[in-house]
């Protein structure tokens, strides 16, 4: 389960089910917001993605190219043998890793849509949604978005070969959008029809 939020909403969601909350990912939006309060507080350029689950879910790390991996070297000291027996992970072998592919971090950077072209103020970039879907699901899985707005997550699911369920009972309130006044479910359906 992935939930997006900021500030007190994030805290409330995390505490609403402490047993299932596992960790947060930071979505760095690149475009900052909050300019009217810039002399009172820092500009905001991130949102939290809270990850909840009962047992270890599908996790397909999206590797990124980086500098070539370096050797971990040899363990030194009295307890060098203990390196191979960890109280959390148990016995393990040291594996030399080569290459330049790196595991992703807890900060994901995807630019949000500029307000002049965004359909919704809470719209998520399709590329961010695709990345999350590739990370936490396998092809053919079902992706549920229970507040899908303009349909970014269902569109991303379709593009990634997943099935999707999207629902929303709101209405587009962005007066600059061609969808102004339309129910979000209709907006999402129309946008999905445009995706090959």
Report each predicted region and the residues it spans.
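Conserved SAM-binding loop
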Residues: 188-189
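Short Fe-S-cluster ligation motifs
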Residues: 196
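Conserved phosphoryl-transfer catalytic core
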Residues: 193
């Amino acid at each position: 389960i992935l939930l997006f939020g900021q500030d007190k909403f994030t805290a409330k969601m995390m505490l609403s089910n402490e047993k299932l909350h596992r960790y947060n990912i930071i979505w760095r939006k690149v475009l900052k917001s909050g300019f009217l309060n810039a002399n009172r507080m820092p500009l905001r350029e991130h949102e939290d993605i809270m990850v909840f689950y009962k047992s270890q879910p599908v996790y397909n790390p999206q590797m990124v190219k980086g500098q070539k991996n370096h050797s971990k070297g040899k363990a030194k000291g009295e307890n060098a043998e203990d390196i191979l027996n960890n109280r959390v992970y148990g016995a393990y072998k040291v594996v030399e890793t080569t290459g330049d592919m790196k595991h992703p971090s807890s900060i994901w950077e995807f630019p949000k849509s500029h307000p002049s072209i965004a359909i919704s103020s809470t719209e998520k970039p399709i590329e961010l949604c695709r990345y999350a879907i590739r990370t936490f699901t396998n092809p053919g899985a079902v992706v549920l978005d229970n507040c899908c707005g303009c349909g970014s997550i269902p569109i991303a699911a379709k593009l990634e070969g997943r099935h999707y369920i999207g629902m929303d009972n709101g209405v587009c309130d962005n007066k600059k959008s061609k969808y102004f006044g339309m129910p979000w479910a209709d907006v999402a359906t129309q946008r999905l029809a445009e995706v090959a």
